[in-house]
Amino acid sequence: MLLLFFGMAHAQVSFTPSPISTNGAERAAVDMNGDFLDDVVSVTATNVQIYYQQPDGSFVERNITTTPADNTPSWSLSAADFDKNGKTDLLYAGGNGVTFMQANNSDGFDEISFPQYVFSQRSNFVDINNDGHLDAFVCHDVAPSVYYINNGDGTFTFHQGDIGDYPSGGNYGSVWVDYDNDGDMDCFIAKCNVNGDVNERSENQLYQNDGAGNFVEVAETAGLKDNMQTWSSAWADFDNDGHLDVFVGSSSANFTHKLNRNNGDGTFTDISASTGIHALTTTGIENCTYDFNNDGYADIASNGNILLNNGDLTFTLIPLALPNNNGSLGDLNNDGFIDSFTGGQIYYNDGNSNHWLTINTIGVESNINGIGARVTITSALGTQIREVRSGEGFKYMSTLNTHFGLGQDTEIATLTIAWPSGIVDTLENVAVDQVISVVEGSTVLGLNESVTNTLILYPNPAQHVLNLGDTTDFTNPSYSIFDMQGRKVMAAPLDANAIDVSTLAMGNYILKIQDGNTLKSQRFIKE
């Protein structure tokens, strides 16, 4: 066990490594089958190896043979459901081009490769034009970056330039964030000049989205036009003031890491000197942010080191808490604490007494994963924000589930999801230490919902009849069933403890039971 003690017991961070046999060096920790449990993924040119996480934290291994990929994810791997079939697709960002592995309805993958030369770096899935379909963005090292607009029919149209358009590239670490709180996704690109020269090629860029699909480069105005050498950045609201701040990690010993505080007016101030981050003198390419000790403040993982957020815009260095590439991050035993997967090992977070909440976002008008949604919670600790993102850090793919630490708070007063479509869902009095799923638009009528995932369903998977456990809490309930596209496929009064699901197509669904102001939901699989 790697034990790292910091301050009071509730702030400790410790990880226990556990071996896992994997194929390939390109990895992800992400739900692949629509059950919202983070799975362990490794890929090669001809194989997708998935360890499907089970509700008890165990795994079931499956290897899926693919056609030999024209491009392997030698530089980065991204994941999302771009065709809305309830299964997660993969993007392979290679040194010569880009390949999509589209998860089909036969439990395999169909290859889609593009002919254009792309020296890929970080890749992301994001709805660039906000039409409800996930597009893809790929940093180009030696030319303007490229993006693939989703046509809504499972195909993409290739574009180059406009976002990350410096002629000789230098585009390394893209991350899509709403830095100006205007409801649309902007793009920050961490840049580098591989020969070490400091010039325009290595000046970080920030592209502001005007909401109409047009992007304007504003890094200099915002105070983020640094020409340090960097491969990635980590964006979070480190002081819980409602504005996203940014840690820019140096990849060169000639530069230091920077923490820039969002002033709330579209500009940033370098506050590095007062934060303690300069205790981190090692450099590298992987930077991301999660609340590793669930104390309600986002921490920074930088090349295996953790900068533990003290809650006052200062950080305490925990050296080499994780492997030096951070790994793919997610909850790999469904206990509410963030774990890491890398190098044939899962590093399980040993946790503490702090509380937590995980939210699964299911888009309807927006993209099905809810990528680009802003999730806000308010508890006694204060207000926290998160965004749903695909592709953070530099190389690996981490969870699409939204994770909050809550310290010792035992209830969340309000939970709000602002979707890319403009729809806003609000839940009140949400219990802690649970995973909830929210379908876009399910609360817009203002219902004061108490959402839990305590429904007992059996058998699950079900073929003909789905039985419910104890329903004595209900007096006059009705039920609705939603598919993974957020469509309501069944609805009726619940007059027995069994629901006939024989007419449903095979796949993943969410059952919602509503009784007055109470709403309970649970996932199930139809076979």
What is each stretch, according to the model?
Residues 23-34, 74-82, 120-130, 149, ...:
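Beta-propeller blade termini
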Residues 46, 96, 141-143, 196-202, ...:
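Short, solvent-exposed loop/turn segments at conserved positions within beta-propeller repeat blades
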